[in-house]
Curated annotation (Swiss-Prot):
Recorded name of the encoding gene: coaX
GO MF entry, a single one: ATP binding
EC number, UniProt record: 2.7.1.33
Transmembrane regions listed in the UniProt entry: none
Catalytic residues (UniProt): D102 (proton acceptor)
UniProt GO BP: coenzyme A biosynthetic process
Oligomeric form and interacting partners: Homodimer.
Name of protein: Type III pantothenate kinase
Recorded catalytic activity of this chain's protein: (R)-pantothenate + ATP = (R)-4'-phosphopantothenate + ADP + H(+)
Organism: Pseudomonas putida (strain ATCC 47054 / DSM 6125 / CFBP 8728 / NCIMB 11950 / KT2440)
Pfam name, any one: Pan_kinase
Residues the entry annotates as binding substrate: Y93, G100, M101, D102, R103, T181
Note on how the cofactor is bound: A monovalent cation. Ammonium or potassium.
Length: 249
């Protein structure tokens, strides 16, 4: 079995899959390396034969995680690294090594699934969009604050905005104008995300008309799902690209 890790800015997304058929044995989201080891170790009758990682962390942090995995599970982790071209997709950055690996692998996965032009909208700590043409050219993309960052900035820099996570969840029962601060903030942030997504869709239409596929991924993808009914929601899109970048037998 293979352990796959997507190490983001705030959390680690993980899953364990069978090598032969990619059936998922277990998975989750954790906020620390130690919590990751504990959750994977808790899976009954799982014996890891490999590990592959995509990380936007520093090299030192990623190396420390690899060492911890080697110690805990006796497997060597394979880390995805930037390349100029892979699987028919050409990296669109002037300095290809500067493109975030999460964005690069999501683009690889999307192009593989779409078999043509595609728009990837990834809504996590940051909101990201990337465009890949029908011939595999990565045309670039956009990054802006995601829901967690928008919410955090308002809570941190506005003294009278204080509420808990349960209140935030209840506030999203609709998107009508808020009648409390929590409703106004949460619904306003969702509308910002939806506006970001709509704008990317219009950019794609200018480029390709209607001949493209939209992919939604990331933890907050459900917040814009209803606004983009034509989109394919692929929660593990980065893992699709990771399997291509780091093949394991």
């Amino acid at each position: 079995m293979i352990l796959e890790l997507d190490c983001g800015n705030s959390f680690i997304k993980w899953r364990v899959i069978h090598v032969a058929d990619a059936v998922i044995e277990g998975g989750g989201i954790v906020d620390s390396d130690q919590a990751l080891v504990a959750e994977v170790a808790a899976l009954a009758s799982v014996r890891l034969t490999g590990c592959r990682i995509v990380s936007v962390r520093s090299e030192e942090e990623t190396d420390a995680l690899c060492a911890l995995i080697a110690q805990a599970f006796a497997v060597q982790a394979k880390v995805a690294h930037p390349v100029r071209e892979m699987a028919g997709v050409r990296n669109g950055y002037d300095d290809y090594q500067r493109l975030g690996m999460d964005r690069w692998l999501a683009a690889l996965g999307a192009f593989h699934l779409a078999k043509g032009a595609c728009l990837v909208i990834d809504l996590g700590t940051a909101a990201k969009a990337d465009f890949v043409s029908a011939d595999g050219e990565h045309l670039g993309g956009y990054i802006c604050p995601g829901m967690p960052l928008m919410r955090s900035q308002l809570r941190t820099h506005t003294r009278r905005i204080r509420y808990d996570d349960a209140s935030a969840e209840r506030a999203l029962s609709s998107l009508s104008p808020g009648r409390s601060t929590v409703e106004a903030v949460e619904r306003g942030c969702v509308l910002m995300l939806q506006g970001f997504a709509y704008t990317q869709l219009e950019q794609a239409r200018v480029l390709w008309g209607e001949e493209f596929t939209v992919f939604l991924t990331g933890g907050d993808a459900p917040l814009v799902r209803a606004a983009l009914p034509q989109a394919r929601v692929v929660p593990d899109l980065v893992f699709v690209g990771l399997a291509m970048a780091c093949p394991l037998d």
